Curated annotation (Swiss-Prot):
A motif (PDZ-binding) lies at residues 703-705. Residues 1-22 form the signal peptide. Residues 636-670 have a biased composition (Basic residues). InterPro entries: Frizzled-4/Mom-5_7TM (IPR047105), Frizzled/SFRP (IPR015526), Frizzled/Smoothened_7TM (IPR000539), Frizzled_dom (IPR020067), Frizzled_dom_sf (IPR036790), FZ4_CRD (IPR041765), GPCR_2-like_7TM (IPR017981). Pfam families: Frizzled (PF01534), Fz (PF01392). It comes from Drosophila melanogaster. The lineage of its organism: Eukaryota, Metazoa, Ecdysozoa, Arthropoda, Hexapoda. This is Frizzled-4. Receptor for Wnt proteins. Most of frizzled receptors are coupled to the beta-catenin canonical signaling pathway, which leads to the activation of disheveled proteins, inhibition of GSK-3 kinase, nuclear accumulation of beta-catenin and activation of Wnt target genes. A second signaling pathway involving PKC and calcium fluxes has been seen for some family members, but it is not yet clear if it represents a distinct pathway or if it can be integrated in the canonical pathway, as PKC seems to be required for Wnt-mediated inactivation of GSK-3 kinase. The gene is fz4.
Length: 705
């Protein structure tokens, strides 16, 4: 054998122990993953701790190999650096002590045989708090830190470190579906609970490690019995489908009234933002009942794939997300638009008050000519068409919805299975639902109260006036107040207050209901909340449909009467007056009558002296005839051949014939005013063919005979 070969063999033999040690230290995972602990020498040699993280931990010396198999402090330092994010997360105040005790165990000359590591209680305390955080990041609990490897207790046979205990005290204020105890950061409540043992029916919950929240099982009966859930399903679904039907009819009327000048069209245009918002809210409820409870409210979570849970993060469920979006965003937008309309009504009342004008001016939509009514818009219409107001009314609810999505507080409720905000988080219900609704309601209510006070002052000023025209203005103002938008806004505000009351009562008592474990939870706040949410839309739809149905009914009645009167006039050849009145005309002091007596023309007979006198009342827009009681009014053929209403008015005394029936010496006069209201058949005919109806006159807003 050559000397060089012998030399190489000696070098390999001498270096063999170091190669084995380096290979072992270079693959710590293999040694740490082995189930059997490493061989520990009978007497250990203590060395100073050189790892920065474990200095000033409570002891200064350690020995290698450690309890997880590492033989060099440099390898241990590299391994501990991988736990730095978990340490910064501060899931447990004892985490650093536990890691140092496991990877850099304490060594003392008084006990040179065994390294002193952590006790099992210290390991389990840290594992309970930090394992969910690791799972949230997608990492399992390290096998090298299995708590079963460590001593159960500290005694004279097995020495270990028990730790000082957790510094964080259990939380007293808990989130809905949470419990007192140590939590992880996140959510509106600061720290979310880590287990579900604080709940009365904890076996019906599954704790989600990533979020730390407790999700109830899909079919769990925690607060309500199955019979109560069935009753609530029938009650709310009935109102939801009724509201959906009204919403469809109101939408058709809204689209059909575009450009119309009827009163119903004015209401539709003014309330169009509220109508569209409540259309979407009603559609959201309809989607919930059409898809079903399971399809909307139940699902699986990646952290618990084997359980069907009530949704706590509804953004992953398309049906749940759509129901939430339509209910929450458009519901908040409806509250914002109601507040805007209250502000507009207040401005409109104050703008026409005597205090601001120095005299009484009836608003343009109360009376006056059509040109004036079209040229002067109300304050509500001005606000609904203002770009800044539209941006605020649509933008604030959008900001709220974005906050809910970022915080991931979209969840389903147990009773109805409808997705919303705060069903499983009382803090979210308080901050993201009750607070904004309360702000909108306070703003709108203050404007309503202020406008009502101004309106009462205006009525008092008018009531103290003796002028007849002012008294008539008072009647018009009172009529507008009883049927105007102020009444609607007041009714809407009451319904909104009931909704707010139900929300406040729910988040104020939900902790008591969950902690008691009693299924006798009151139904009324939950049913009232859902009912009022739908009733707000029903009020809007009914308020728009009311004038439309009334106008349609009056038009049908008016057309039927006109056809009947026209047939009677064609049979006799003379029509002395049209009486197709569409409403009550008792607004004047004189008696309103219609004449249908038909007389044969007597053009060849000289006319007797006129027994009546034509009087015009410019203040009321009417023509009065002082007529003897035993005379009937007829119209000559010569008069019907006139083509100018002005000419007819000028020569009216010469072309009327009066035929006495009885004694001419007893003359009793009665004042009669003949007119046709705006919108009647005769008024429409005059506006279309004025030259062919010379016996009709257009006076202001009325068609007069």
């Amino acid at each position: 054998m050559k000397p060089t070969c012998i030399l190489c063999l000696l070098v390999v033999i001498l270096l063999h122990p170091r190669i084995s040690k380096s290979s072992t230290s270079g693959n710590p995972s293999a040694s740490s993953s082995s189930s059997s602990p490493p061989e520990i020498p009978a007497f250990r040699q203590c060395e100073t701790i050189r790892i920065e993280m474990c200095r000033k931990i409570g002891y200064n010396e350690t020995s290698m190999p450690n309890l997880v198999g590492n033989e060099m402090q440099t390898d241990v330092e590299y391994t501990l650096q991988t736990f730095a994010p978990l340490i910064e997360y501060d899931c447990s105040s004892q985490l650093k002590l536990f890691l140092c005790a496991a990877y850099v165990p304490m060594c003392t000359p008084k006990a040179p045989v065994h390294a002193i590591g952590p006790c099992r209680s210290l390991c389990e305390s840290v594992r309970i708090r930090c394992h969910p955080v690791l799972q949230g990041f997608g990492f399992p609990w390290p096998p090298a830190l299995d708590c079963d490897k460590f001593p159960r207790e500290n005694n004279h046979e097995t020495m270990c470190m028990e730790g000082p205990g957790e510094l964080h005290q259990p939380q007293q204020e808990q989130d809905l579906y949470g419990l007192p105890g140590q939590g992880i950061p996140g959510g509106l409540g600061g720290k979310l609970p880590m287990d579900c043992s604080g709940l009365a029916k904890s076996h019906l919950y599954v704790r989600l490690p990533r979020s730390g929240r407790c999700a109830p099982l899909c079919e769990a009966d925690i607060l309500f019995t199955p019979a109560e859930k069935h009753l609530a399903e029938i009650w709310v679904s009935t109102w939801a489908y009724a509201a959906l039907g009204l919403a469809l009819v109101a939408t058709v009327c809204l689209l059909a009234s575009d450009g119309s000048r009827l009163a119903s069209a004015k209401w539709s245009r003014l309330l169009s933002p509220l109508i569209w918002c409540h259309n979407m809210v009603t559609l959201g409820w309809a989607v919930r009942f059409m898809v079903g409870r399971t399809g909307t409210a139940c699902g699986t979570d990646p952290q618990a794939p084997n359980e069907s849970l009530l949704t706590v993060d509804g953004l992953s469920n398309a049906s749940c997300a759509s129901v939430f979006l339509m209910r929450y965003y458009f519901g908040m937008a409806a509250c914002a638009w109601w507040a805007v309309l209250c502000l507009g009504w207040h401005r409109d009342i104050r703008r026409h008050s005597p205090d601001s004008k120095g005299h009484v001016v009836i608003p343009s939509n109360f009376g006056g000519s059509p040109a004036k009514r079209n040229s002067a818009k109300t304050a509500q219409q001005d606000l609904t068409q203002n770009n800044f107001v539209c941006f605020v009314a649509w933008g604030l609810p959008a900001f709220q919805t974005s906050a809910v999505i970022v915080a991931r507080f979209v969840d389903a409720d147990e009773l109805l299975g409808a997705c919303f905000v705060g069903n499983q988080s009382d803090k979210a219900l308080q901050i993201l639902v009750a607070t904004p609704v309360f702000c909108y309601w306070i703003f709108g209510s203050m404007n309503l109260i202020s406008g009502y006070l101004v309106h009462c002052r205006t009525k008092e000023i008018l009531r103290n006036s003796n002028a007849l025209s002012v008294q008539q203005q008072l009647q018009q103002l009172s009529a507008h107040s009883s049927s105007g938008i102020g009444i609607f806004l007041f009714i809407y505000g009451l319904a909104c207050a009931m909704l707010l009351l139900a929300v406040i009562y729910e988040f104020a008592n939900i902790d008591v209901w969950l902690g008691s474990g009693d299924t006798n939870t009151p139904l009324w706040p939950f049913l009232l909340r859902a009912f009022m949410e739908l009733m707000l839309g029903i009020c809007c739809f009914a308020w728009v449909l009311g004038p439309s149905i009334s106008t349609l009914y009056k038009r049908q009645v008016s057309n039927g009467k006109m056809v009947k009167h026209t047939s009677a006039g064609a049979a006799t050849g003379h029509l002395d007056g049209h009486s197709s009145s569409r409403g009550s005309h008792a607004a004047c002091n004189s008696t309103v009558v219609s004449y249908h007596s038909v007389r044969t023309s007597m053009a060849s007979v000289p006319l007797p002296p006129s027994p009546y006198k034509l009087k015009t009342s410019p203040g009321t827009g009417s023509i009065s005839l002082n007529q003897m009681s035993n005379y009937s009014l007829g119209r000559s053929v010569h008069h019907q051949q006139r083509h100018s209403p002005h000419h007819h008015h000028h020569q009216q005394q010469q072309h009327h014939q009066f035929h006495p029936h009885h004694n001419h010496q007893h003359h009793s006069t009665s004042s009669h005013r003949l007119y046709y209201p705006p919108g009647s058949y005769a008024s429409q005919k005059y506006s279309q063919h004025g030259s062919y109806y010379p016996h009709l006159q257009q006076y202001g807003n009325e068609t007069l005979l």
